[in-house]
Amino acid sequence: MGVRMLACVILGFLAVAINCDEAPNITADATTITTTRKPIPYQDSNICKLCKCEDTKVNCYDQSITTFFTLNEWEDIIDLKPSTVDLSENRFTNITVIADLTIEVLNLSRCSIEFIQSGSFRDLQEMRVLDLSHNKLTTDKLSPHAFEGRFAPEEYEPLASMRILNLAYNDLHSLNQDLFEHMPELEELDLSGNPLTTIDHVTLVAISSLPMLKVLRLRSCELDEIPSKFLHTPRFLENLDLSDNKLTIVPRELEEAKDLIYLNLNQNPIEVIDFYSEDNPGFPRLHKLQELHMCNMPKLRSIGPKALAGLESVEKLHISFNPSLSYLDPKALARPDDIGESFDWPLVKELYLKSNNLTEVDTRLLSRWDLLEKVDVSDNPFLCDCSTQWMVDVLAPIVESKGSNATLMVCQEPIEMRGHTMKDLHDSHRTMRCVDKYGHRPEKDGAILLGTLIGVLLAVPIMLSLMLLWRRGYFAWLGLRPPADVSRAFYKRAPADDILY
């Protein structure tokens, strides 16, 4: 009996041991079963029910989506192999991890996004363009971890394909100095519309960490200066937009951008650009710059000699809609040659001087007007005299031949020329006179001389008639006696009883 009891106890322990040993495998199998999802056609996915999915494009524009898609929902469209995903104009505020997809362009603009989870884009290894503009991202909530790549034993892998990042019109007052550490190949960065006010040290470090940067947009960032060495590291920078800021002078730091091709300084409160001024210096030497924009600058009054001389290769010059710009020096673009005996000019192909306050465009501004491909100098209060005769004879035909309207080149002064167009003056072969140096108006002399002559011719017979009437006594009632009465009064006989002394 005792032996049987012992055998039963031993068998019981063995059974428990066997069950305990098999339990993990059972649990593991159960877990596998619960986590494995049955694949579905991408047409039946939740994403493609809410959005339009076709031709490797997912269009979710303005679909009132309030919650970002889950990882599983993204996995359901793997077979679609999407290259472009547009989720703009929706209402979600948080971004979570996206599945391993072939997305190249991802648009998340205008969605009120406030937070991006760490590693949200880590599996998008083919993504080239990411648009996060017009959201509510702040300096505190935009972490470098948001852009980290896949995990590796030593460090996170970069988002190697990323080339364009748009962070415009968020609420960024500064940038984390490591914000772009996972995007070493980034070529285009847009920070426009963020209230940076100034480029502090950490922001400078962040942007300086992008050695391959080619395009930088800082429009409407309330900047009043550009810090030293800001443009030193991005040595391949070609396109720089500093428009609509508070710059009062042309930044000297531009000389660090040796490869700059395009520069936009529109809507800045610059008043004077003068090569010889320390307070308002001209442009530094930018020998590769091809296109310059200085438009809609209400305070710009004067562009002096050699102010633009540093722009040796400029081809497109936009200086329009500056209502106070009344002086553009004839040698604004001229630079001394290597010998110093003469001047060289850039070969400008497109010149826009529309809607300024210029009274003339000097022929010396360019060396080869005939090489212009586009030109617009309309809507300026031109002085039409001998100094602008060349505009009538040469410039007006050039403007007309390039597709612009020369009838918009209208004379404002002198008064007798007001309203005449330079095209009409050219067609009528009009030769304009020189305005008097002291402001005299000889064109009015004829009227004055004619009036004087008429006055003299009328005054002589009138005076003769009055003299005749006076001699005949017609004005006696006025106390004006005729000459006969006066002469008789001189010889009146004296009385006989007058006593002589």
Predicted regions and their residues:
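Extracellular leucine-rich repeat
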Residues: 2-501
